[in-house]
Amino acid sequence: MIYRDQLSTPLGTLTLEATDRGLSSVRFPNRAGPCAGQSPDNSVISQAKQELTDYFAGELKQFSVPLDWQGTDFQQSVWEALTNIPYGETVSYADVARAIGRPKSARPTGGAVGANPLPIIVPCHRVIGSDQTLTGFTGGLNIKVALLELEGRLIE
C-alpha cells in the first residue's frame, strides 16, 4: 500500500509518500503529481513529517526515517553516497562519483542525483558543480539556495 500525506513547510507544501518499508517519495509543490492528498495514518509518514519539521526549524541535521527508494543499483549507490554528505557542506558530482568508486562517472552520477525521489531527506541539494556553481534541482534553484542557506552554506 502507498501512504500519502502533505506537509506545509517554508518552501511550500511537500507531498510525502511511503510504503510499509519506508519513505518512497518527497515532492515539491511544482511536482505534486497525481493523487496528492491524504491516506490512512502511517508511522513512516508521521516520522518523516516530524523530522522535516525539525529540519526546517534548524533542530535536525541528519534524517533517520526508514527509506524505500526504487532505482537501479547505480542510482541507489549514488543516493546512499548522498546521505553521507554532512549538513551544511557541499560536494561536486565528481566527488560523489569518486565516493562510489566510479571516478570517471560524474555525468551518470549527475543523472542519478537528478533522479533522487527523496530530496531534502537524501540531500541532493548539497551537490554543486565542480566550479562551485549551482546546478539543477528538482524543486528549482531558488529552493536549492534556500536549503543551503538554511544549513548555513552561503552561496554567491
Language-model-detected regions and their locations in the chain:
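Major-groove DNA-recognition helix of helix-turn-helix-type DNA-binding domains
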Residues: 121
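Residues in the recognition helix of alpha-helical DNA-binding motifs
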Residues: 112
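…primarily DNA-binding HTH/wHTH and HhH modules…
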Residues: 130-156
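Terminal helix-turn-helix DNA-binding modules in bacterial transcription factors
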Residues: 115-117
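Basic nucleic-acid-binding alpha-helical/helix-turn surface characteristic of O6-alkylguanine DNA
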Residues: 1-104, 150, 154-156
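Short cysteine clusters
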Residues: 124
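Helix-turn-helix DNA-binding helix
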Residues: 106-109
